[in-house]
């Protein structure tokens, strides 16, 4: 069976790009464990050295979506997540944003994993907060409905990745799969705020989300962070109405102070969980500001507000009124084993 992939690998080695059909077929085969580890590693390496194309990214995402264990909520959802890999070890921003967005009335299907290159991934800090990250689908749906947020643990929903995960770990460098977490939400979130680890991926991932059927999405990179940032300027690609629009955002433009990276640097999962608890309890400062900015983007993408500044103000009210904290508490209650 593995001999069937040799012609494709030869083309990749010569620098060719894969057609949509070839890419879809190859990645689907990878998720079934058909190519040998050496063949998967060779393909990933060739694509990384040449530069992954938009078609290859979309095809790989489609293959992952088909192989996923899906959650099917009866209402529209939004996801707020990043690719990770920025290497800056910040506090958990998108995790906190999920609770603020839920407290503001959105239904947040938060897709995430344990830390890969950071010290504290979404799953790590949620575990410290008392959330059962292994909650069954019926509990996830209940949490979405009643708490406004659920957590979709990537390994549980993308079990087919077990065929490629050891290969990725052995390679030790970024591959196309590092871009795919935000493109493969198991609940089929049609609206998203996606952070990417490098600015060059802002526009391509927005285009990919459009190809994959998103209604509206922001793909962002902020001064080295896979988030909107208060430490500098954020580059944004908005997909909406079938088009991609590029623009930049500064914190001052929405009434926020510029911060230093040191002000939002995190630590262990336990330390980041404590910081998140203090934030939800009303603590002000740089962490609150960057969370409010990212939550504002979620509110805007979900058409909850008309401007980013209005979104920042709504995020502040949600935090001050304890609604984000209530979302966390209800999520913990519902997912308890």
Curated annotation (Swiss-Prot):
It is an enzyme of class 2 (transferase). Anthranilate 2 binds at residue 168. Anthranilate 1 binds at residues 82, 113. Pathway: Amino-acid biosynthesis; L-tryptophan biosynthesis; L-tryptophan from chorismate: step 2/5. Mg(2+) 2 binds at residues 226-227. Its cofactor is Mg(2+). Catalyzes the transfer of the phosphoribosyl group of 5-phosphorylribose-1-pyrophosphate (PRPP) to anthranilate to yield N-(5'-phosphoribosyl)-anthranilate (PRA). This is Anthranilate phosphoribosyltransferase. It comes from Phenylobacterium zucineum (strain HLK1). The gene is trpD.
């Amino acid at each position: 069976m593995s001999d069937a992939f040799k012609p494709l690998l030869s083309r990749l080695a010569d620098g060719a790009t894969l057609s949509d059909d070839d890419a879809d077929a190859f990645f689907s085969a990878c998720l079934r464990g058909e190519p040998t580890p050496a063949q998967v590693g060779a393909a990933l390496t060739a694509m990384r050295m040449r530069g992954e194309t938009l078609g290859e990214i979309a095809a790989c995402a489609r293959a992952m979506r088909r192989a996923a264990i899906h959650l099917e909520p009866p209402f529209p959802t939004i996801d707020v997540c990043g690719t990770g890999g920025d290497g800056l070890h910040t506090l958990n921003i998108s995790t906190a944003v999920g609770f603020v967005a839920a407290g503001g009335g959105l239904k947040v299907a938060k897709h995430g994993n344990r830390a890969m290159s950071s010290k504290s991934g979404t799953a790590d800090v949620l575990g410290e907060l008392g959330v059962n990250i292994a909650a069954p689908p019926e509990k996830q749906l209940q949490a979405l409905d009643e708490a406004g947020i659920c957590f979709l643990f990537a390994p549980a929903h993308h079990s087919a990745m077990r065929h490629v995960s050891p290969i990725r770990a052995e390679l030790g460098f970024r591959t196309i799969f590092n871009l795919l977490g935000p493109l493969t939400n198991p609940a089929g979130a049609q609206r998203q705020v996606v952070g990417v680890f490098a600015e060059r991926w802002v526009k391509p991932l927005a285009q990919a989300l459009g190809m994959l059927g998103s209604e509206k999405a922001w793909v962002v990179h902020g001064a080295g962070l896979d988030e909107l940032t208060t430490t500098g300027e954020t580059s944004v690609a908005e997909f909406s109405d079938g088009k991609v629009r590029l623009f930049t955002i500064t914190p001052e433009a929405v009434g926020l102070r510029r911060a230093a990276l040191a002000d939002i640097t995190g630590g262990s999962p336990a330390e980041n969980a404590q910081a998140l608890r203090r934030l939800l309890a009303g603590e002000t400062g740089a962490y609150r500001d960057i969370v409010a900015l990212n939550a504002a983007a979620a509110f805007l993408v979900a058409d909850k507000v008309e401007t980013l500044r209005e979104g920042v103000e709504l995020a502040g009210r949600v935090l001050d009124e304890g609604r984000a904290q209530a979302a966390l508490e209800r999520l913990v209650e519902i997912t308890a084993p």
